[in-house]
């Protein structure tokens, strides 16, 4: 190695190291895996609207669809590639030349294009779904990437069901993919089977034993079948993964994918724990984008959904309400404004306390001074009503005061 090449080698390693250690990249698959949510079907204009919202959010990569799946998917990817700027546009393809060519054709007008090639690599999938041997899978990966190389800006390779695969074989497949031109290696927990520490251990093993991995970014794609998609994604980041595949509101097959809002706000809120990893996401867009996706897909956001649910910043317990009025940090680890929500909601109900009730009276314009005895009387009437009704509205409070 001459001196010039040695300098280039160090620059290359330093560049990859920066990508691997300091920044987490976000790959949104709402328009592909998210659309696989049962009952969801998006038209091309709706997909374009969501894609533009993802750009405003600051998403690095938008997986626009699976062009070989249907003419509609091809049209959607092609339209997004042509009209949406500011993010890498990605298309999914199975490991065969026909799928790959469809994806390449759909992406041709993209500002920056990524081909996402996948094939199953677990023994279960290879035997019962693919009916292929390990060697046949290795040969297929090699030949397909040779066909695709140079026809798009970048290639991502996914080993479907990698989390349940033999790790040494997974490393071998990933090494072949990197040698063939893949610069992003995705490790899916396809069926949401992993435990966080277990998944982190697998990511570390892949990082240490995959040939050429220093020239690639490790990505993860976690499903939520056991409610662990966010925990597994964060554990993988701790272990060295630097791309997370996610969806808005956690949409996706079966129990869904990890919600981007959960991963990002975990990293932001606990930046001390994650050593200030760089996250280039405008979190104030979350609530607006969540509502847009919910409206267009017809999938309601559960009220108790972390970050974007309607109850995420709502407080009914009297003890909590008193704490919130004293200092919001007593019961909120982030502000509603930080995710684009309007404000904290103090909800009056049977669990509410006297402090919250008195504060609400003032908010309703009852500025006259009530005696302690009168406030106690009004509060007793409120509690009696709250025991009988699920919701106590402002009109109910006014009626109590003026009766």
Task: Tell me the role of every PLM-derived stretch.
Residues 194-197, 201-322:
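Catalytic alpha/beta core domains of metabolic enzymes, predominantly
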Residues 26-29, 62-64, 87-93, 113-117, ...:
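Hydrophobic faces of well-ordered beta-strands that scaffold small-molecule active sites
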Residues 32, 67-69, 92-96, 118-122, ...:
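Active-site beta-loop-alpha junctions enriched in small/polar residues
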Residues 42-59, 82, 97-213, 234-239:
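Alpha/beta enzyme core
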Residues 23-24, 30, 265-267, 272-403:
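A mid-to-C-terminal "edge-of-domain" accessory segment
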Residues 4, 13-96, 345-348, 352, ...:
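N-terminal capping/small domains of soluble enzymes
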């Amino acid at each position: 190695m001459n001196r010039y090449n040695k300098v280039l080698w160090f620059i290359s390693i330093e560049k990859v190291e920066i990508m691997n250690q300091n920044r987490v990249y976000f790959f949104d698959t709402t328009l592909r895996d998210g659309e696989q949510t049962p009952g969801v079907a998006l038209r091309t204009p709706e997909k374009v609207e969501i894609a533009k919202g993802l750009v405003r959010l600051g998403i690095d990569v938008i997986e626009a669809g699976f062009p070989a799946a249907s003419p509609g998917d091809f049209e959607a990817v092609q339209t997004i590639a042509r009209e949406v700027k500011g993010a890498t546009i990605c298309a999914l393809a199975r490991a065969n030349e026909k799928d790959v060519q469809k994806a390449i054709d759909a992406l041709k007008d993209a500002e920056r294009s990524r081909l996402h090639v996948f094939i199953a690599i677990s023994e279960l999938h290879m035997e019962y779904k693919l009916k292929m041997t390990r060697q046949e899978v290795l040969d297929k990966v090699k030949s397909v990437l040779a066909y695709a190389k140079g026809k798009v800006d970048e290639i991502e390779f996914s080993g479907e069901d990698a989390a349940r695969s033999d790790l040494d074989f997974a490393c071998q497949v990933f090494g072949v993919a990197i040698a063939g031109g893949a610069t992003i290696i995705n490790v899916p927990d396809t069926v949401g089977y992993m435990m966080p520490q277990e998944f982190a251990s697998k990511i570390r093993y892949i990082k240490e034993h995959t040939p050429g991995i220093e020239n690639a970014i490790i990505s993860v794609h976690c499903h939520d079948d056991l409610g662990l998609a966010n925990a597994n994604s964060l554990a993988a980041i701790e272990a060295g993964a630097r791309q997370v595949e996610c969806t808005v509101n956690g949409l996706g097959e079966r129990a869904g994918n990890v919600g981007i809002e959960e991963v990002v706000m975990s990293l932001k809120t606990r930046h001390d724990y994650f050593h200030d990893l760089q996250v280039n996401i405008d979190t104030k867009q979350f609530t607006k984008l969540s509502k847009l996706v919910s409206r267009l897909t017809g999938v309601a956001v559960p009220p108790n959904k972390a970050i974007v649910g309607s109850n995420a910043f709502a407080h009914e317990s009297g003890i909590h309400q008193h704490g919130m009025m004293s200092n919001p940090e007593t019961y909120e680890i982030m502000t509603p404004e930080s995710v684009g929500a309007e404000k904290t909601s103090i909800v009056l109900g049977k669990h509410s306390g006297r402090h919250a009730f008195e504060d609400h009276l003032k908010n309703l314009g009852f500025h006259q001074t009530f005696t302690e005895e009168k406030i106690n009387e009004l509060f007793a009437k409120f509690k009696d009503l709250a025991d009988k009704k699920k919701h106590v509205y402002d009109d109910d409070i006014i009626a109590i005061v003026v009766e």
